[in-house]
Amino acid sequence: MASHSAAGRRPTALVHIALFVAIAAVIINSSVCLGAAVHDAATSGTGALDPNVPAVPTPGGAGQPYTGRGCRTVYGCKPPAGSQP
């Protein structure tokens, strides 16, 4: 009887190992991609490592105040005359 219960646990352990390997592969892949993006930004002079580029872009553009979420017809608001919805 003891060997039967041990055999029942073996597939569960294999599933856990397979899930761990799959998740680790995804994490490693995304880390490599992020590292490449930071490296490309550093070599091109744009991005988070450039002191002349703001860390957080402003939605209104450079020098424009933040006016909140953009106006969309879905929100039930009307944009000011001459602006895009």
UniProtKB/Swiss-Prot annotation:
Gene Ontology CC annotation, any one: membrane
Cytoplasmic face of the membrane: 1-12
Major subcellular site: membrane
Function: Associated with pathogen defense.
Its membrane topology: Single-pass type II membrane protein
Subcellular location: Membrane
Keyword Transmembrane helix applies: yes
Organism: Triticum aestivum (Wheat)
Top-level taxon of the source organism: Eukaryota
TM ranges: 13-34
Entry keywords, A to Z: Membrane, Transmembrane, Transmembrane helix
Name of the molecule in the record: Protein WIR1B
Stretches assigned to the Extracellular side: 35-85
